[in-house]
Amino acid sequence: MISFNNVSKVYESGGQSVHAVEDVTLSVEKGEIFGIIGFSGAGKSTLLRLVNMLERPTAGTISIDDKDITSLSTKELRKLRQRIGMIFQSFNLFNSRTVFGNIAYPLKLAKVPKNEIKERVNELLKFVGLEDKANNYPEQLSGGQKQRVGIARALATSPDILICDEATSALDPETTTEILNLLKKVNREYNLTILLITHEMHVVKEICHRVAVMEKGKVIEEGKLFDVFTQPKTTTTQNFVRSVINDHLPESVLAKIQNGGQIYRLTFTGEETGQPVLSYIAKNYNVDVNVLYGNIIELQNVLFGNLLVELQGEQREIQKALQHLRLQVQLKEVEAHAS
């Protein structure tokens, strides 16, 4: 649905060229939630602004439904933007308008008849759970309620695409979960394509089908959520994943391990997570198993387990145990200082 083809955006600053986005090629499929994650300055926000042509690319093309939007006329561009809703970190509500008025605003701009505006706004108020807040002003709302208004306003013109710019960054953890659940509901019930940017990996984990990692204007890794989480290739991606799966061991534990024993990382997927593999090798081989770290998370309805274990015993027995483990799970030896 959305395609970036060798897209670059260059700014001139102090006589130097700054590559905010550099040679990005990405495809976002219709009906999916696609996340773009990166630290500040990675180029995420610039890439989003290129989708609705608030910024024009210096090079490359951007297509929506196989149509090159970089060549659209002003009139065609105005029509395109009606298909794209957007929500922001800072909500961007009109403080002088009620909740009803904020949601109705894009419909008035589109010259929708008053009776249809009322019907649509009431429908959206119910959808986002704010039926009793129609006459309230933004200052009377919590942060989560303000973002619900922002989502309703973004949906007002029945867009095909919803762009989310750090939509949960200003919210507490509980409210973040509520907003992410609402966005999943939007995606599910309206079959809306959602393109979001964030610097928080737990947001990606909770909501995205696929994800791209940006650094210094470039996409350095991209793929299905499960693949990126379970097999991160770059150091930056590995650091993001560790913000959700923190498997670094304390120095005091590492010091003891370095005096003996071997560390292995075991990863389980799907039904493997329920198998008693460690108890089996402890019973059937002369090996002591010390679990140093354990974690199980769910990624797009698939379980992923991650264990760090220390094996102690005679080398021959350890090798027998490892041979059995390799038949059951993914196994990798880990140096103590690199755990």
UniProtKB/Swiss-Prot annotation:
Keywords: Amino-acid transport, ATP-binding, Cell membrane, Membrane, Nucleotide-binding, Translocase, Transport. It is a peripheral membrane protein. It comes from the Bacteria. It is found in: Cell membrane. InterPro entries: AAA+_ATPase (IPR003593), ABC_transporter-like_ATP-bd (IPR003439), ABC_transporter-like_CS (IPR017871), ACT-like_dom_sf (IPR045865), MetN_ABC (IPR041701), MetN_ABC_transporter-like (IPR050086), NIL_domain (IPR018449), P-loop_NTPase (IPR027417). It catalyses: L-methionine(out) + ATP + H2O = L-methionine(in) + ADP + phosphate + H(+); D-methionine(out) + ATP + H2O = D-methionine(in) + ADP + phosphate + H(+). GO terms for molecular function: ABC-type D-methionine transporter activity; ATP binding; ATP hydrolysis activity. It holds the Pfam family NIL. One of its GO terms (cellular component) is plasma membrane. ATP binds at G38, F39, S40, G41, A42, G43, K44, S45. Residues 2-241 form the ABC transporter domain. Its main location: membrane. Its EC number is 7.4.2.11. Belongs to the ABC transporter superfamily. Methionine importer (TC 3.A.1.24) family. PANTHER family: AMINO ACID IMPORT ATP-BINDING PROTEIN, METHIONINE IMPORT ATP-BINDING PROTEIN METN. The complex is composed of two ATP-binding proteins (MetN), two transmembrane proteins (MetI) and a solute-binding protein (MetQ). Part of the ABC transporter complex MetNIQ involved in methionine import. Responsible for energy coupling to the transport system. This is Methionine import ATP-binding protein MetN 2. It comes from Bacillus anthracis.
